[in-house]
Amino acid sequence: MRNPLGLRFSTGHALLASALAPPCIIAFLETRYWWAGIALASLGVIVATVTFYGRRITGWVAAVYAWLRRRRRPPDSSSEPVVGATVKPGDHVAVRWQGEFLVAVIELIPRPFTPTVIVDGQAHTDDMLDTGLVEELLSVHCPDLEADIVSAGYRVGNTAAPDVVSLYQQVIGTDPAPANRRTWIVLRADPERTRKSAQRRDEGVAGLARYLVASATRIADRLASHGVDAVCGRSFDDYDHATDIGFVREKWSMIKGRDAYTAAYAAPGGPDVWWSARADHTITRVRVAPGMAPQSTVLLTTADKPKTPGGFARLFGGQRPALQGQHLVATRHCQLPIGSAGVLVGETVNRCPVYMPFDDVDIALNLGDAQTFTQFVVRAAAAGAMVTVGPQFEEFARLIGAHIGQEVKVAWPNATIYLGPHPGIDRVILRHNVIGTPRHRQLPIRRVSPPEESRYQMALPK
Protein backbone atom coordinates (compact mmCIF):
# COMPACT_ATOMS: atom_id res chain seq x y z
CA MET A 1 0.00 0.00 0.00
CA ARG A 2 1.28 3.46 -0.89
CA ASN A 3 2.53 5.58 2.02
CA PRO A 4 0.17 8.61 2.21
CA LEU A 5 2.86 10.85 3.74
CA GLY A 6 5.61 12.48 1.76
CA LEU A 7 7.98 15.45 1.64
CA ARG A 8 8.01 18.27 -0.90
CA PHE A 9 10.36 21.24 -0.89
CA SER A 10 9.79 24.47 -2.80
CA THR A 11 11.49 27.85 -2.65
CA GLY A 12 8.30 29.79 -1.94
CA HIS A 13 7.16 27.64 0.98
CA ALA A 14 10.70 27.50 2.41
CA LEU A 15 11.06 31.29 2.34
CA LEU A 16 7.65 31.77 3.95
CA ALA A 17 8.41 29.28 6.74
CA SER A 18 11.85 30.79 7.41
CA ALA A 19 10.35 34.31 7.51
CA LEU A 20 7.57 33.42 9.98
CA ALA A 21 9.50 31.08 12.30
CA PRO A 22 11.74 33.70 14.08
CA PRO A 23 8.84 36.13 14.90
CA CYS A 24 6.80 33.23 16.31
CA ILE A 25 9.65 32.16 18.60
CA ILE A 26 10.45 35.75 19.70
CA ALA A 27 6.78 36.55 20.41
CA PHE A 28 6.53 33.82 23.06
CA LEU A 29 10.15 33.89 24.28
CA GLU A 30 9.52 36.19 27.30
CA THR A 31 6.31 34.43 28.38
CA ARG A 32 5.64 31.31 30.39
CA TYR A 33 4.48 29.69 27.14
CA TRP A 34 7.88 29.91 25.48
CA TRP A 35 7.36 26.46 23.96
CA ALA A 36 4.35 27.72 21.96
CA GLY A 37 6.61 29.70 19.63
CA ILE A 38 8.70 26.62 18.89
CA ALA A 39 5.52 24.60 18.35
CA LEU A 40 4.15 27.18 15.90
CA ALA A 41 7.44 27.29 14.01
CA SER A 42 7.51 23.49 13.83
CA LEU A 43 3.91 23.46 12.62
CA GLY A 44 4.84 25.94 9.91
CA VAL A 45 7.68 23.69 8.74
CA ILE A 46 5.30 20.71 8.65
CA VAL A 47 2.71 22.66 6.67
CA ALA A 48 5.39 23.82 4.22
CA THR A 49 7.07 20.45 3.60
CA VAL A 50 4.85 17.48 4.52
CA THR A 51 2.35 16.19 1.96
CA PHE A 52 -0.62 13.89 2.48
CA TYR A 53 -1.55 11.90 -0.62
CA GLY A 54 0.52 14.24 -2.77
CA ARG A 55 -0.75 17.56 -1.41
CA ARG A 56 0.29 19.91 1.39
CA ILE A 57 -2.36 20.99 3.90
CA THR A 58 -2.63 24.28 2.02
CA GLY A 59 -3.11 22.32 -1.19
CA TRP A 60 -5.98 20.33 0.33
CA VAL A 61 -7.65 23.53 1.50
CA ALA A 62 -7.35 24.98 -2.00
CA ALA A 63 -8.65 21.74 -3.55
CA VAL A 64 -11.72 21.70 -1.29
CA TYR A 65 -12.45 25.35 -2.08
CA ALA A 66 -12.09 24.81 -5.83
CA TRP A 67 -14.28 21.68 -5.71
CA LEU A 68 -17.03 23.48 -3.78
CA ARG A 69 -17.01 26.28 -6.36
CA ARG A 70 -17.31 24.07 -9.45
CA ARG A 71 -19.32 21.06 -8.19
CA ARG A 72 -22.69 22.59 -9.10
CA ARG A 73 -21.55 24.02 -12.43
CA PRO A 74 -21.71 21.97 -15.64
CA PRO A 75 -18.32 21.43 -17.30
CA ASP A 76 -17.22 23.91 -19.93
CA SER A 77 -17.94 22.59 -23.40
CA SER A 78 -15.51 22.85 -26.29
CA SER A 79 -16.24 25.27 -29.10
CA GLU A 80 -17.57 24.14 -32.46
CA PRO A 81 -14.68 22.91 -34.62
CA VAL A 82 -13.46 24.92 -37.58
CA VAL A 83 -11.58 23.29 -40.45
CA GLY A 84 -8.59 25.24 -41.70
CA ALA A 85 -6.58 24.48 -44.82
CA THR A 86 -2.83 23.98 -44.53
CA VAL A 87 -0.26 25.04 -47.07
CA LYS A 88 -0.93 21.74 -48.87
CA PRO A 89 -3.93 22.01 -51.20
CA GLY A 90 -6.80 19.79 -50.12
CA ASP A 91 -5.27 18.87 -46.76
CA HIS A 92 -7.45 19.98 -43.84
CA VAL A 93 -7.24 19.93 -40.06
CA ALA A 94 -10.05 20.73 -37.61
CA VAL A 95 -9.29 23.08 -34.71
CA ARG A 96 -11.40 24.23 -31.78
CA TRP A 97 -11.14 26.00 -28.44
CA GLN A 98 -10.86 23.78 -25.38
CA GLY A 99 -10.75 26.05 -22.36
CA GLU A 100 -7.98 28.57 -22.97
CA PHE A 101 -6.19 26.38 -25.54
CA LEU A 102 -6.73 26.01 -29.27
CA VAL A 103 -6.44 22.30 -30.07
CA ALA A 104 -6.10 20.01 -33.08
CA VAL A 105 -6.20 16.23 -33.13
CA ILE A 106 -4.03 13.65 -34.89
CA GLU A 107 -5.32 10.08 -35.06
CA LEU A 108 -2.79 7.25 -34.89
CA ILE A 109 -3.71 4.40 -37.24
CA PRO A 110 -3.04 0.90 -35.83
CA ARG A 111 -0.76 -1.41 -37.77
CA PRO A 112 -2.92 -4.31 -39.07
CA PHE A 113 -2.23 -7.91 -38.04
CA THR A 114 0.04 -6.92 -35.16
CA PRO A 115 0.01 -9.53 -32.37
CA THR A 116 0.46 -8.70 -28.70
CA VAL A 117 2.29 -11.20 -26.50
CA ILE A 118 1.97 -10.94 -22.72
CA VAL A 119 5.20 -11.88 -20.91
CA ASP A 120 5.22 -11.63 -17.11
CA GLY A 121 2.38 -9.11 -17.15
CA GLN A 122 3.99 -6.90 -19.81
CA ALA A 123 2.54 -6.39 -23.29
CA HIS A 124 5.01 -6.84 -26.15
CA THR A 125 4.02 -5.49 -29.56
CA ASP A 126 5.63 -3.45 -32.33
CA ASP A 127 2.59 -1.17 -32.69
CA MET A 128 3.93 1.43 -30.25
CA LEU A 129 4.50 5.17 -29.86
CA ASP A 130 7.48 6.45 -27.89
CA THR A 131 6.52 9.53 -25.86
CA GLY A 132 10.15 10.62 -26.09
CA LEU A 133 9.80 10.75 -29.88
CA VAL A 134 6.80 13.07 -29.54
CA GLU A 135 8.78 15.41 -27.28
CA GLU A 136 11.66 15.39 -29.75
CA LEU A 137 9.38 16.28 -32.67
CA LEU A 138 7.77 19.09 -30.68
CA SER A 139 11.19 20.46 -29.71
CA VAL A 140 12.32 20.57 -33.34
CA HIS A 141 9.17 21.73 -35.15
CA CYS A 142 6.93 23.56 -32.64
CA PRO A 143 8.61 24.02 -29.22
CA ASP A 144 5.86 26.31 -27.93
CA LEU A 145 3.15 23.62 -28.27
CA GLU A 146 2.34 20.69 -26.00
CA ALA A 147 0.74 17.36 -26.84
CA ASP A 148 -1.67 15.05 -25.04
CA ILE A 149 -1.45 11.41 -26.12
CA VAL A 150 -4.93 10.07 -25.36
CA SER A 151 -5.92 6.40 -25.58
CA ALA A 152 -9.47 5.19 -25.01
CA GLY A 153 -10.91 1.70 -25.07
CA TYR A 154 -12.10 -1.31 -23.10
CA ARG A 155 -10.76 -4.69 -22.01
CA VAL A 156 -14.00 -6.57 -22.71
CA GLY A 157 -17.20 -5.55 -24.47
CA ASN A 158 -20.82 -5.48 -23.39
CA THR A 159 -22.63 -6.83 -26.45
CA ALA A 160 -22.41 -10.55 -25.60
CA ALA A 161 -24.33 -12.56 -23.03
CA PRO A 162 -23.16 -11.79 -19.45
CA ASP A 163 -21.92 -15.38 -18.94
CA VAL A 164 -19.73 -15.10 -22.04
CA VAL A 165 -18.20 -11.80 -20.89
CA SER A 166 -17.61 -13.13 -17.37
CA LEU A 167 -15.88 -16.26 -18.70
CA TYR A 168 -13.62 -14.25 -21.00
CA GLN A 169 -12.66 -11.95 -18.12
CA GLN A 170 -11.59 -15.03 -16.16
CA VAL A 171 -9.59 -16.36 -19.11
CA ILE A 172 -7.62 -13.16 -19.76
CA GLY A 173 -7.20 -12.33 -16.05
CA THR A 174 -5.16 -9.17 -15.57
CA ASP A 175 -3.45 -9.21 -18.98
CA PRO A 176 -2.94 -5.62 -20.23
CA ALA A 177 -4.72 -6.58 -23.45
CA PRO A 178 -7.73 -4.37 -24.26
CA ALA A 179 -10.13 -5.76 -26.82
CA ASN A 180 -10.55 -2.25 -28.23
CA ARG A 181 -8.26 0.79 -28.07
CA ARG A 182 -7.81 3.91 -30.19
CA THR A 183 -5.13 6.58 -29.77
CA TRP A 184 -4.93 10.26 -30.65
CA ILE A 185 -2.42 13.07 -30.20
CA VAL A 186 -4.10 16.33 -29.18
CA LEU A 187 -1.90 19.34 -29.97
CA ARG A 188 -2.53 22.26 -27.59
CA ALA A 189 -1.66 25.88 -28.37
CA ASP A 190 -1.60 28.52 -25.63
CA PRO A 191 -2.24 31.93 -27.30
CA GLU A 192 0.30 33.68 -25.04
CA ARG A 193 3.13 31.18 -25.49
CA THR A 194 2.61 30.89 -29.25
CA ARG A 195 2.14 34.60 -29.95
CA LYS A 196 5.42 35.08 -31.86
CA SER A 197 5.01 31.93 -33.96
CA ALA A 198 1.38 32.76 -34.76
CA GLN A 199 2.10 36.37 -35.75
CA ARG A 200 4.49 35.16 -38.45
CA ARG A 201 1.48 33.67 -40.27
CA ASP A 202 -1.34 36.13 -39.56
CA GLU A 203 -2.82 38.44 -36.95
CA GLY A 204 -4.81 37.25 -33.94
CA VAL A 205 -6.71 33.96 -33.86
CA ALA A 206 -6.28 33.43 -37.60
CA GLY A 207 -2.50 33.29 -37.19
CA LEU A 208 -2.78 30.96 -34.22
CA ALA A 209 -5.07 28.60 -36.16
CA ARG A 210 -2.74 28.55 -39.16
CA TYR A 211 0.26 27.85 -36.96
CA LEU A 212 -1.54 25.00 -35.17
CA VAL A 213 -2.79 23.46 -38.43
CA ALA A 214 0.66 23.61 -40.02
CA SER A 215 2.25 22.13 -36.88
CA ALA A 216 -0.26 19.26 -36.76
CA THR A 217 0.42 18.43 -40.40
CA ARG A 218 4.17 18.55 -39.84
CA ILE A 219 4.03 16.33 -36.74
CA ALA A 220 1.84 13.78 -38.56
CA ASP A 221 4.30 13.68 -41.47
CA ARG A 222 7.29 13.24 -39.18
CA LEU A 223 5.55 10.45 -37.26
CA ALA A 224 4.90 8.66 -40.54
CA SER A 225 8.60 8.91 -41.39
CA HIS A 226 9.30 7.13 -38.08
CA GLY A 227 6.94 4.27 -38.88
CA VAL A 228 3.85 5.56 -37.04
CA ASP A 229 0.85 6.01 -39.35
CA ALA A 230 -0.79 9.30 -38.35
CA VAL A 231 -3.66 11.26 -39.91
CA CYS A 232 -4.76 14.80 -39.01
CA GLY A 233 -8.37 14.87 -37.87
CA ARG A 234 -10.92 16.62 -40.08
CA SER A 235 -13.37 16.51 -37.15
CA PHE A 236 -13.44 15.69 -33.44
CA ASP A 237 -16.41 13.30 -33.66
CA ASP A 238 -14.55 10.01 -33.18
CA TYR A 239 -12.38 11.46 -30.42
CA ASP A 240 -15.36 12.92 -28.56
CA HIS A 241 -17.31 9.67 -28.84
CA ALA A 242 -14.40 7.57 -27.56
CA THR A 243 -13.69 9.84 -24.58
CA ASP A 244 -17.28 10.63 -23.57
CA ILE A 245 -18.16 9.40 -20.05
CA GLY A 246 -21.67 10.85 -19.86
CA PHE A 247 -20.77 13.50 -17.27
CA VAL A 248 -23.61 14.34 -14.87
CA ARG A 249 -22.01 15.52 -11.62
CA GLU A 250 -18.56 15.70 -10.03
CA LYS A 251 -18.19 14.24 -6.56
CA TRP A 252 -15.14 14.46 -4.30
CA SER A 253 -13.74 11.07 -5.31
CA MET A 254 -15.52 10.24 -8.60
CA ILE A 255 -17.66 11.51 -11.45
CA LYS A 256 -21.27 10.41 -11.68
CA GLY A 257 -22.24 9.57 -15.24
CA ARG A 258 -25.58 8.83 -16.86
CA ASP A 259 -25.37 5.12 -16.05
CA ALA A 260 -21.86 4.58 -14.65
CA TYR A 261 -19.15 6.02 -12.43
CA THR A 262 -15.74 7.33 -13.52
CA ALA A 263 -12.75 7.85 -11.23
CA ALA A 264 -9.47 9.58 -12.08
CA TYR A 265 -6.20 8.11 -10.82
CA ALA A 266 -2.47 8.56 -10.81
CA ALA A 267 -0.69 5.31 -11.68
CA PRO A 268 3.09 5.44 -12.12
CA GLY A 269 3.36 1.91 -13.55
CA GLY A 270 2.77 2.86 -17.18
CA PRO A 271 0.46 1.30 -19.79
CA ASP A 272 0.89 -2.27 -18.55
CA VAL A 273 -0.58 -1.20 -15.20
CA TRP A 274 -3.19 1.12 -16.71
CA TRP A 275 -4.69 -1.50 -19.04
CA SER A 276 -4.59 -4.39 -16.56
CA ALA A 277 -7.17 -2.79 -14.25
CA ARG A 278 -10.70 -4.11 -14.64
CA ALA A 279 -13.04 -1.44 -15.96
CA ASP A 280 -15.85 -1.04 -18.46
CA HIS A 281 -13.97 1.80 -20.15
CA THR A 282 -10.45 3.19 -19.80
CA ILE A 283 -9.01 6.56 -20.83
CA THR A 284 -5.30 7.34 -20.46
CA ARG A 285 -3.70 10.72 -21.03
CA VAL A 286 0.04 11.46 -21.24
CA ARG A 287 1.05 15.09 -21.67
CA VAL A 288 4.37 15.84 -23.36
CA ALA A 289 5.99 19.27 -23.60
CA PRO A 290 9.54 20.19 -24.65
CA GLY A 291 11.93 20.33 -21.72
CA MET A 292 9.42 19.04 -19.16
CA ALA A 293 8.83 15.65 -17.58
CA PRO A 294 5.78 13.83 -18.97
CA GLN A 295 2.56 13.89 -16.95
CA SER A 296 -0.26 11.36 -16.96
CA THR A 297 -3.64 10.44 -15.58
CA VAL A 298 -5.95 7.44 -15.94
CA LEU A 299 -9.76 7.40 -15.89
CA LEU A 300 -11.59 4.14 -15.20
CA THR A 301 -15.34 3.83 -15.78
CA THR A 302 -17.33 1.12 -14.00
CA ALA A 303 -21.02 0.31 -13.60
CA ASP A 304 -20.72 0.26 -9.80
CA LYS A 305 -19.01 2.73 -7.48
CA PRO A 306 -15.28 2.38 -8.14
CA LYS A 307 -12.72 0.69 -5.93
CA THR A 308 -9.10 1.80 -6.24
CA PRO A 309 -7.01 -0.90 -8.00
CA GLY A 310 -3.59 -1.86 -6.71
CA GLY A 311 -0.88 0.54 -7.89
CA PHE A 312 -3.38 3.37 -8.43
CA ALA A 313 -3.94 6.52 -6.34
CA ARG A 314 -7.30 8.32 -6.49
CA LEU A 315 -7.12 12.04 -7.34
CA PHE A 316 -9.45 13.25 -4.60
CA GLY A 317 -10.96 16.65 -5.24
CA GLY A 318 -9.58 16.79 -8.76
CA GLN A 319 -11.83 14.50 -10.77
CA ARG A 320 -13.16 17.04 -13.27
CA PRO A 321 -9.77 18.74 -13.78
CA ALA A 322 -8.26 15.30 -14.48
CA LEU A 323 -11.01 14.58 -17.01
CA GLN A 324 -10.31 17.90 -18.74
CA GLY A 325 -6.53 17.43 -18.68
CA GLN A 326 -5.92 20.07 -16.00
CA HIS A 327 -4.78 17.76 -13.17
CA LEU A 328 -1.93 15.48 -14.24
CA VAL A 329 0.80 13.72 -12.28
CA ALA A 330 4.48 13.58 -13.22
CA THR A 331 5.61 10.32 -14.81
CA ARG A 332 8.40 9.12 -17.10
CA HIS A 333 8.71 8.54 -20.83
CA CYS A 334 7.35 5.20 -22.00
CA GLN A 335 6.24 3.18 -25.01
CA LEU A 336 2.47 3.50 -25.51
CA PRO A 337 0.55 0.81 -27.44
CA ILE A 338 -1.47 2.39 -30.25
CA GLY A 339 -4.18 -0.04 -31.31
CA SER A 340 -6.18 -2.87 -29.81
CA ALA A 341 -4.54 -5.98 -28.41
CA GLY A 342 -7.60 -7.80 -29.76
CA VAL A 343 -8.84 -11.33 -29.17
CA LEU A 344 -6.98 -14.13 -27.37
CA VAL A 345 -5.99 -16.62 -30.10
CA GLY A 346 -3.55 -18.86 -28.22
CA GLU A 347 -0.26 -18.90 -26.37
CA THR A 348 3.43 -19.40 -27.11
CA VAL A 349 5.37 -22.54 -26.22
CA ASN A 350 6.34 -20.72 -23.00
CA ARG A 351 2.64 -20.24 -22.13
CA CYS A 352 2.63 -16.52 -22.90
CA PRO A 353 -0.83 -15.39 -24.10
CA VAL A 354 -1.05 -14.20 -27.72
CA TYR A 355 -3.68 -11.65 -28.81
CA MET A 356 -4.53 -10.54 -32.35
CA PRO A 357 -6.61 -7.46 -33.33
CA PHE A 358 -9.45 -7.97 -35.81
CA ASP A 359 -11.14 -4.56 -35.51
CA ASP A 360 -9.12 -2.48 -37.97
CA VAL A 361 -9.42 -4.07 -41.47
CA ASP A 362 -11.92 -6.31 -43.26
CA ILE A 363 -10.72 -9.90 -43.67
CA ALA A 364 -11.94 -13.36 -44.63
CA LEU A 365 -11.11 -15.69 -41.73
CA ASN A 366 -10.63 -19.41 -42.31
CA LEU A 367 -11.09 -21.38 -39.08
CA GLY A 368 -9.57 -24.83 -38.82
CA ASP A 369 -12.13 -26.87 -36.89
CA ALA A 370 -15.26 -26.67 -34.74
CA GLN A 371 -13.36 -25.96 -31.53
CA THR A 372 -11.37 -23.13 -33.13
CA PHE A 373 -14.61 -21.72 -34.57
CA THR A 374 -16.30 -21.85 -31.17
CA GLN A 375 -13.41 -20.27 -29.30
CA PHE A 376 -12.94 -17.42 -31.76
CA VAL A 377 -16.64 -16.55 -32.05
CA VAL A 378 -17.24 -16.72 -28.28
CA ARG A 379 -14.17 -14.61 -27.49
CA ALA A 380 -14.91 -12.11 -30.27
CA ALA A 381 -18.42 -11.66 -28.87
CA ALA A 382 -16.95 -11.08 -25.40
CA ALA A 383 -14.51 -8.59 -26.94
CA GLY A 384 -17.39 -6.42 -28.15
CA ALA A 385 -18.05 -7.69 -31.67
CA MET A 386 -21.53 -8.17 -33.13
CA VAL A 387 -21.67 -11.83 -34.18
CA THR A 388 -24.02 -13.09 -36.90
CA VAL A 389 -24.44 -16.84 -37.51
CA GLY A 390 -26.68 -18.93 -39.75
CA PRO A 391 -30.18 -20.16 -38.82
CA GLN A 392 -28.83 -23.63 -38.02
CA PHE A 393 -26.83 -22.08 -35.12
CA GLU A 394 -29.91 -20.82 -33.26
CA GLU A 395 -29.10 -22.49 -29.91
CA PHE A 396 -25.46 -21.38 -30.11
CA ALA A 397 -26.54 -17.82 -30.93
CA ARG A 398 -28.90 -17.75 -27.95
CA LEU A 399 -26.10 -18.81 -25.58
CA ILE A 400 -23.61 -16.15 -26.65
CA GLY A 401 -26.00 -13.32 -27.58
CA ALA A 402 -25.40 -13.50 -31.35
CA HIS A 403 -27.71 -12.56 -34.23
CA ILE A 404 -29.21 -14.84 -36.87
CA GLY A 405 -28.56 -14.00 -40.52
CA GLN A 406 -27.67 -15.45 -43.89
CA GLU A 407 -24.00 -14.39 -43.79
CA VAL A 408 -21.75 -15.62 -40.98
CA LYS A 409 -19.63 -12.68 -39.84
CA VAL A 410 -18.12 -10.87 -36.87
CA ALA A 411 -18.52 -7.09 -37.05
CA TRP A 412 -16.68 -4.31 -35.23
CA PRO A 413 -17.42 -0.61 -35.79
CA ASN A 414 -14.53 -0.22 -38.24
CA ALA A 415 -14.10 -3.73 -39.66
CA THR A 416 -15.99 -6.89 -40.58
CA ILE A 417 -14.62 -10.44 -40.30
CA TYR A 418 -16.25 -12.85 -42.75
CA LEU A 419 -16.07 -16.46 -41.55
CA GLY A 420 -15.66 -17.88 -45.01
CA PRO A 421 -14.44 -16.92 -48.49
CA HIS A 422 -15.06 -13.30 -49.48
CA PRO A 423 -13.65 -11.64 -52.61
CA GLY A 424 -11.50 -8.54 -52.58
CA ILE A 425 -10.15 -8.65 -49.01
CA ASP A 426 -7.19 -10.21 -47.20
CA ARG A 427 -7.38 -13.80 -45.99
CA VAL A 428 -6.35 -14.95 -42.50
CA ILE A 429 -6.00 -18.55 -41.37
CA LEU A 430 -6.52 -19.56 -37.73
CA ARG A 431 -5.73 -23.13 -36.70
CA HIS A 432 -5.19 -24.74 -33.32
CA ASN A 433 -1.41 -24.49 -33.77
CA VAL A 434 -0.82 -21.57 -36.15
CA ILE A 435 -2.21 -18.25 -37.31
CA GLY A 436 -1.40 -16.97 -40.78
CA THR A 437 -1.88 -13.33 -41.80
CA PRO A 438 -0.65 -11.20 -44.71
CA ARG A 439 2.01 -9.94 -42.32
CA HIS A 440 2.92 -13.20 -40.53
CA ARG A 441 2.63 -16.15 -42.87
CA GLN A 442 3.09 -18.76 -40.15
CA LEU A 443 2.93 -17.64 -36.51
CA PRO A 444 3.06 -20.76 -34.29
CA ILE A 445 0.68 -20.82 -31.33
CA ARG A 446 -0.83 -23.32 -28.92
CA ARG A 447 -4.51 -23.59 -28.11
CA VAL A 448 -5.83 -22.16 -24.82
CA SER A 449 -8.82 -24.30 -23.83
CA PRO A 450 -10.57 -23.49 -20.54
CA PRO A 451 -13.04 -26.31 -19.83
CA GLU A 452 -15.91 -23.84 -19.36
CA GLU A 453 -15.84 -23.05 -23.11
CA SER A 454 -16.72 -26.62 -24.07
CA ARG A 455 -20.44 -26.12 -23.39
CA TYR A 456 -20.63 -23.61 -26.23
CA GLN A 457 -19.13 -26.12 -28.65
CA MET A 458 -21.73 -28.68 -27.58
CA ALA A 459 -24.43 -26.23 -28.71
CA LEU A 460 -23.21 -26.37 -32.33
CA PRO A 461 -25.41 -28.33 -34.76
CA LYS A 462 -24.34 -31.93 -35.18
Could you describe each region identified by the protein language model?
Residues 112, 153-155, 189-193:
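Short loop/turn segments at secondary-structure transitions that flank enzyme active sites
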Residues 2-4, 113-117, 363:
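Short small-residue beta-strand/loop micro-motif enriched in glycine and branched aliphatics
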Residues 132, 136-145, 381, 387, ...:
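A short, charged
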